[in-house]
Amino acid sequence: MTLPQILTPSIEKAVKVLFDVIIDKVEFQTTRKEFEGDITMVIFPLLKVVKSNPVELGNKIGNYLVENVAEVSRFNVVSGFLNIVISDDYYLDFFGGIKDDVTFGFVTPNPEDKAVMVEYSSPNTNKPLHLGHVRNNLLGYSVAEIIKASGKKVYKTQIINDRGIHICKSMLAWQKFGNGQTPESTGLKGDKLVGNYYVAFDKAYKEEIAQLMSAGKTEEEAKKQAPIILEAQEMLLKWEAGDDAVITLWKTMNQWVYDGFAITYKNLGVNFDCYYYESNTYLLGKDVVQIGLDRGVFEKDPDGSVWIDLTDEGLDRKIVLRSDGTAVYMTQDIGTAIQRVKDYPDVGGMVYTVGNEQDYHFKVLFLILKKLGFDWSKNLFHLSYGMVDLPSGKMKSREGTVVDADDLMQEMTDTAQKIAEDLGKLDSYSPEEKAKLYSTIGLGALKYYILKVDPKKRILFNPEESVDFAGNTGPFIQYTYARIQSIIRKANFDFSNKSKMVVLHEKEKELVKQLELFPEVIQNAAQHHSPALLANFTYDLVREYNSFYQAVPILGEEDLEKKIFRVQLSKKVADTIAASFSLLGINVPERM
């Protein structure tokens, strides 16, 4: 039980006994650093039902708790706040209960509960994953893991945008300029090779536009009449008609991209349970349009196009079917959502990890599904996030200046290597151990820097700053974990049995209090879809541990019971760091 769960019934009873008043809610908050106390009860709300001043009221309740609740040792009242000091016995008992609990903080899913499907990544198959995809993947993966740890079954999915004019641009450019190149013949990852041809198409397209404009065409006319764009449009029509040659090329080049993506995903440490492809889903939803028309949810215009009027909800009119009968993205997303629930009947909610430029789209999508009568629509959530910028500027993919995810990960590993080599202490490492350490530190720095920020906020990502071994960074936390592992390796005595400690040092108590927060932080992070809550909890835990480390001897402690307890406490902190970082997709090194 948590402290609020322990104290609330006793406080309710105290108010009934002392004032003959029944209350149904007790408000708690963390005790401010300048006051003594482990938890604070807010007195002000009670003044509405109890005729007393806050200090008198606080003192009466405090005295009652000291006399009747074993966990309460003393208290103090400051204005309208009752600061409660909890006994060492409570924290020692709590720690004894979690010391060997390898699943501490994690909740086992109930098979009867509905599952959650989390969508993330969802790339186009015409270029490599870039910096924006990195934030998307890290957020989606972490949120999925956190929701799973909170006690829900989770499916990780993505919808791959594998069709359309942008795909045909890469295909056409390869036909024109590729000379039969393959990933094998060039030594390039497949996604990078295909991305090169997307850039090549754009270059040729711009040259043709310039030529047409010099011949007297307007820019708008030139963009429409450039031969290469007309060829790409013709290729798209052939794809839609099922042309064998076009379909074969499409499958071949897409497979190159998938093979490249698989390497990036593996290096980034993310995975998926199921995949959806736009080529299979772009016609989904058209049947739903007729259902919507029959129910009066949609309306048909004279030109045959179908719309939904959401002006009363402040979202304007939205087209769901063009006049020529072709679907729009909204229609596809409606159909895909419905299909997912058909494929996975235990799914009762979905999380869409998509940038904030799509905020309007998802408001409309969720409202349409609600109006169509799907009960699960109330459990849809758009995990909206801001753009990631580098100090050198924003990304552009068509011009070949995109910040590739692969290049970024390599840069992070190289930066970590340079810093680690400058710090020294690597003489005993084999080349393989060094390479693993550099990757662990570099990717840990990247992931933590991105995930510690609230998803809604835009990020200016500074690679060198993220690899700093001091402050709120991944490497700082990893270093603390490795330091604890060193302590455990040096502990040449049995510390497995429960310590007979009876009095806690202030720093020990603060550390146990921080550990106690872990289960609640996981639940809050899941509820708010925010890995930042977990990341910053871990940083606070590490800061508390380093304060403890500086204040008291651990292996140098002469009292055996204290030494045993401090090693056990250190180990539990390390275990909690590792557990928390696992939910963020970050590895921890055994030594640094």
Language model features with spans:
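Non-catalytic interaction-recognition regions
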Residues: M1-L92, T103, N110-M592
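Short, charged, solvent-exposed linker or helix-capping segments at domain edges/interfaces
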Residues: D93-I98
